[in-house]
């Protein structure tokens, strides 16, 4: 089987066609770093043991991705309750395959100590307030996304671009955006916890959408264009097409979402696109669809796939496949579609490191393009399980010996 290391969960034919088309080609990787104060809520995320740690998770991941394990980082990888940062996976592949990496700061509280492209964004406030970002910032970030998506795709006609993310608390903002777009996502998202904290996420999302709804009514008289409140009673209802999806991001989103949406819309016009992640990238895909419709932008949905890990796709405490299929049923677009959802078959069950075996218990799961990196290794060099595991374990080994 040519794709024995890659599982296709939705849109099988389209997924197989995409894999056929890009077999043997080397992608470039664009990683968008963002921050939402939602990530500081106690218990919301396992990506950093304390809220203070979580402020620096993206900085630490970016440094490791860029410099590797021998570099003495300004921000070391944060201690996790269990597991190890997924950046070990991405770094193992990108270093071995020499895949070019471009880092983008969409809005971080502290800039990372790596060469990156600053998009002039800002961190988002907690989504529970219903006013996460200034609309001017959202518009600016979207334009930057379109610009950089076109640039990254410029010489990639026969290949594809991977867009990844690092946003602590990002599955909660993803739930908020999906819900605001009329997609029934409650109880279907993932998290970095072994058992997803659905109740905590949903309470924050409800609070944020209600506050955004109140604000919408205040601004536009009685009718309130963004009538989120009826949405919450009926998550399946579709918001009227007059609602600006960028306004939804301003209300309850994070800076990464709108940047990657812009990048992927622009890149899809000239090359393949793999959105690297699970829940967060399904939200980005839904957002792309809604933005393209609202602003009459051309894009190529059939060029886009979502690539993640098996731990996300088969998370028994989420429902990723069901969520992917739900994109057709909600969405501000009449032509809401489900993208092919691909996942690497990578397993850590036989790893000699307990931090990696923790992934098999449901910790961490994904981030920094980890799943997509493994898919790329298989597509371009036909890497199998043993080669992937050895490369990832080598990163961990080098990290543990680097400063001892």
Predicted features, each with a name:
Residues 2-164, 168-216, 238-404:
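N-terminal loops that bind phosphate or other acidic moieties
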Residues 214-240:
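Short, C-terminally biased terminal segments at protein or domain edges
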């Amino acid at each position: 089987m040519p794709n024995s290391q890659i599982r296709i969960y939705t849109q099988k034919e389209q997924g197989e066609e995409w894999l056929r088309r890009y077999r043997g080609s080397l992608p470039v990787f664009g990683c968008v770093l963002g921050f939402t104060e939602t990530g500081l809520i106690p218990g919301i995320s396992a990506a950093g043991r304390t809220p203070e740690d979580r402020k620096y998770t993206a900085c630490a991941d970016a440094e490791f991705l860029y410099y590797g394990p021998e570099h003495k980082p300004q921000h070391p990888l944060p201690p996790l309750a269990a597991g190890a940062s997924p950046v070990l996976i991405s770094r193992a592949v990108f270093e071995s395959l020499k895949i070019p990496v471009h880092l983008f700061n969409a809005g971080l509280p502290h800039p990372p100590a790596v060469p990156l492209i600053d998009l002039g964004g800002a961190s988002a406030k907690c989504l529970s307030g219903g006013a996460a970002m200034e609309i001017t910032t959202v518009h600016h970030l979207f334009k930057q996304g379109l610009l950089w998506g076109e640039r990254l795709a410029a010489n990639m006609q026969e290949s594809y671009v991977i867009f990844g993310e690092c946003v602590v608390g990002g599955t909660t903002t993803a739930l908020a955006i999906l819900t605001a777009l009329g997609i029934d996502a409650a109880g279907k998202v993932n998290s970095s916890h072994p058992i997803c904290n659905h109740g905590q996420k949903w309470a924050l999302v409800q609070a944020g959408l209600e506050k955004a709804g109140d604000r919408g009514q205040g601004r536009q008289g009685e009718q309130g264009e963004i009538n989120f409140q009826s949405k919450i009673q009926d998550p399946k209802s579709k918001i009227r097409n007059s609602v600006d999806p960028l306004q939804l991001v301003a209300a309850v989103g994070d800076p990464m979402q709108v940047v990657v949406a812009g990048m992927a819309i622009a890149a899809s016009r000239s090359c393949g696109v793999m959105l690297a992640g699970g829940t967060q990238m399904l939200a980005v895909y839904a957002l792309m669809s809604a933005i393209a419709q609202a602003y009459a932008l051309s894009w190529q949905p059939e060029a886009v796939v979502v690539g993640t890990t098996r731990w996300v796709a088969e998370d028994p405490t989420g429902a990723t496949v069901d969520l992917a299929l739900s994109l057709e049923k909600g969405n501000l677009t009449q032509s809401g579609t489900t993208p092919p959802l691909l996942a690497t078959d990578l397993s850590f069950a036989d790893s000699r490191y307990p931090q990696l075996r923790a992934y098999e218990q449901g910790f961490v799961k994904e981030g920094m393009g980890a799943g997509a990196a493994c898919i790329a290794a298989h597509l371009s060099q036909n890497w199998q399980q043993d080669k992937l595991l050895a490369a990832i374990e080598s990163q961990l080994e080098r990290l543990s010996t680097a400063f001892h």
